[in-house]
Amino acid sequence: MGNWLLPEGLADVLPAEARRIEELRRELLDLYRTYGFELVAPPLVEYIDSLLSGMGGDLNLYTCKLIDQLSGRTLGVRADMTTQVSRIDAHLLNRNSVTRLCYCGTVLHARPADLLSSRELLQIGAEIYGHVGFEADLEILQLVLETVAIAGVSRPRLDLSHPGVVKALFDADPAAAAISGRIIMLLREKDVAGLAELAGVEPALRADTLAALGALVRLYGEIDVIDRARQELPALPALVLALDELERLARAVPDVALGLDLADVGGYGYHSGVTFELYAQGWHDALVRGGRYDDVGRAFGRARPATGFSLDLRKLAAGLSPAEPGRAIRAPWGQDPALVGAVRALRHTGEIVVQVLPGHEHDQDEFVCDRELVLQDGAWTVKTL
């Protein structure tokens, strides 16, 4: 095996792709700032108990672990930045007002999420803390849609769900709550037969709970799913509230293709309100994920209402058209003060000036040099090639 080979699921980012990723990073962080989001930068590595606080067990499987040489405690390389940002809000900033935070940094997965996914992601996201209402959820959704619009993603589709629907069924039926893990697995797999078999193996389950679980796997589609759910599911107060929250948010974003799936329980145990995933042609999986998660900060001693989203910038860039080569000005190498001053002045205006090193006058691959800095009538002048 060659020493230059990288581990499975990891890859170098070459100049054209790196340029596209960096352009997106700058544009998106600038966008988030216009909404009032403050940039934070948590560390790449933390103690494992802090890093996984308030998160589901799935994140533990994705977290690379190592031993701290100074303390002997177990460290984790972050696989997601959301918990870290929640820690900053709850423990370090300790504000009582609404706080908007954004972030961008590398995360590492111990294993890829699927056969086509990378183990190293450049995660960017935004979170609103301190407001439990619809308004914060809508602001996050609007920011998601503006994010993909700026990136050039065409015809996105937004899929909404709400874990409160399933939680209401569990709260109303202790027998269902006792086997919640098994039911969640069956709902994730849309296993209609498996759900039907519960009647024979779990006699304590209420009939209306079994009927509701069977209905959930069929309750997907457009916004009319809400009306069907009101007819087919029991009118439990918490369940009705979840449907109301889902419908209000869905109707607030009429200009995007929308889908609802009431059996989508991917964030169960972590999310506490409306959840969403954004899909688009050219990406095999969800491009953006997010939702409400009000209880994560409790692990840091201060539970705050929270809602937000994140995406992988490298994944986003990979599905976009390649970046155009940069336009540059070619200049000779030299120590003439007038030349040095002319080059510096051009660079200060934002121009790319590539000084050609001796013997490499015809070597230029990365940039398209459409202009040249030449000495004309005793002055350095830019001429079009």
From Swiss-Prot:
Keyword Protease part of the UniProt annotation: no
Keywords: Amino-acid biosynthesis, Cytoplasm, Histidine biosynthesis
Pathway, per record: Amino-acid biosynthesis; L-histidine biosynthesis; L-histidine from 5-phospho-alpha-D-ribose 1-diphosphate: step 1/9
InterPro entries (alphabetical): aa-tRNA-synth_II/BPL/LPL (IPR045864), HisRS-like_core (IPR041715), HisRS/HisZ (IPR004516), HisZ (IPR004517)
Function in brief: Required for the first step of histidine biosynthesis. May allow the feedback regulation of ATP phosphoribosyltransferase activity by histidine.
Further information: This function is generally fulfilled by the C-terminal part of HisG, which is missing in some bacteria such as this one.
Protein name: ATP phosphoribosyltransferase regulatory subunit
Lineage, uppermost ranks: Bacteria, Pseudomonadati, Pseudomonadota, Betaproteobacteria, Burkholderiales
Name of the coding gene: hisZ
